[in-house]
């Protein structure tokens, strides 16, 4: 496959590698974009301070020091061009062929995707993603992450790590280096996370995330929908038994409060 702004991808070879991948089907493509375009996108990323003004800031036990911008009207021109490329019919059809997932669809709203920037000290705990978007009625099937981090040595962390279904053993890890695309089929066993980021304060981990959906449910789906589900790594015992349950309780309590407020508002309108 060869599309404008994108380096050639051997679809057949990548499909075979995905089928043989440990843990769950995944892939890694270096030199994903044409170099000039990759540099253009790299230079277009906002600073962390700028991103905070327009995006959603995460500061929780599970996800910390991360900003996410999903509104494409706020994308700089080069990043908007990347969004359009990854949502194009030609690219989406090629991803269906490569992954073996028929009838993939892009998400124009980029729910949970778009520009991701994580500051030094940030992290993302191991999780499986929400499996269904109630706003569109579509099933989430594929994640693709494109990284834009130059001069990123191993000690900076921020690796994408992939885990077995019990979250006992890491089955693969990818450095978030410049112009690398990593992707995987999302499922009930596609446990993944981002290792702690330890880069200098003047740097940040930058990526662009896109997620793809189908109208049809995946084979073997049990009919249950869920939001993001987190698990502690084997080395994070206290987080798993104390911090995560405490935060889950706080979220559940807040959800109940919000629901009660909505009920009161409806009653007052009658």
Regions found by a protein language model. Give the residues of each.
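Non-heme Fe(II)/2-oxoglutarate
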Residues: 5-6, 15-98
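Catalytic core of Fe(II)/2-oxoglutarate
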Residues: 121, 132-140, 150-270
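Active-site rim elements
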Residues: 27, 72, 77-85, 129, ...
């Amino acid at each position: 496959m060869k599309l404008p702004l994108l380096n050639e991808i051997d679809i057949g070879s990548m499909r075979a590698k995905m089928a043989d991948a440990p843990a769950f089907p995944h892939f890694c493509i270096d030199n994903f974009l044409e170099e000039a375009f990759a540099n253009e996108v790299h230079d277009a990323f906002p600073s962390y301070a700028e991103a905070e003004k327009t995006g959603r800031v995460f500061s929780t036990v599970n996800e910390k020091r991360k900003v996410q911008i999903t509104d494409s009207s706020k994308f700089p021109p080069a990043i908007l061009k990347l969004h359009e490329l990854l949502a194009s019919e030609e690219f989406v059809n090629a991803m269906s062929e490569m992954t073996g997932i028929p009838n993939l669809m892009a998400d124009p709203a980029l729910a949970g995707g778009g520009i991701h920037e994580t500051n030094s000290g940030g992290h993302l705990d191991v999780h499986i993603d929400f499996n269904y978007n109630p706003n569109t009625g579509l099933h989430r099937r594929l994640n693709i992450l494109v990284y834009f981090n130059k001069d990123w040595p191993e000690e900076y962390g921020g690796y994408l790590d992939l885990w077995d279904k019990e979250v006992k053993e890491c089955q693969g890890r990818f450095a978030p280096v410049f112009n690398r695309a990593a992707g995987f089929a999302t499922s009930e066993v596609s446990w993944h996370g981002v290792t702690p980021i330890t880069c200098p304060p003047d740097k940040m981990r930058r990526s662009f995330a896109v997620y793809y959906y189908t109208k049809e449910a995946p084979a073997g789906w049990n009919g249950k929908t869920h939001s993001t589900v987190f698990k502690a790594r084997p080395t994070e015992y206290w987080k798993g038994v104390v911090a995560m349950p405490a935060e889950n309780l706080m979220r559940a309590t807040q959800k109940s409060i919000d629901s009660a407020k909505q009920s009161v508002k409806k009653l007052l309108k009658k």
